[in-house]
Amino acid sequence: AAVLASMSMSAQQNISFREGKLVSPQVNSDKTVTFRLKAPKAKSVKVLADWEQNNGQGTLKKGKDGVWEYTTPQLASEMFTYRFDVDGVVGIDPVNPFTRRDVGDVFSIFYVGGGVADEYQVKDVAHGQVRTVWYHSNTINADRRMNVYLPAGYGKTDKKYPVFYLLH
């Protein structure tokens, strides 16, 4: 039996669509994080995030070049999600290619390393794979789709695996 799970995954490519030299977010050596957004015509810009300090909010200040900037207080090691609120319109960071989907919302993400967040990093270990398969359901007399996680090495031996069903 295979380990079965219905899951949502988002792959992340390290693609560079940063605008010139603008870097956001910038995780600093003191575990603060600096956000930047080029919005020369904006009247107000906030960062809305899931860290605890300041209720997860920060107000960016506008620079002469139209780039808004905010640096957080020191953050714990973790994976954080955030979005920008520009004059009441909320969206992801346009120069950060790393995102996470949560049901109907998409968030930009970043990691503050040196602790818990290190567990999110890709490790040099054998990785399994997720396959999308179709099956016929006699109960509803229709074809259904599911995602199946297969551990590394699955199918190469007669080893039996436990089954885990996640329905949501």
Q: What is each stretch, according to the model?
A:
Residues R36-S77, D87-G113, L150:
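Aromatic-rich carbohydrate-binding modules that target alpha-glucans
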Residues K31-F35:
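Structural beta-strand segments of beta-rich domains
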Residues V45-V47, Y82, M146:
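Short beta-strand elements bearing conserved aromatic residues within extracellular beta-rich modules
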Residues A1-Q13:
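Bacterial Sec-dependent N-terminal signal peptides
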Residues Q12-N28, Q74-I140:
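The feature marks proteins involved in alpha-glucan
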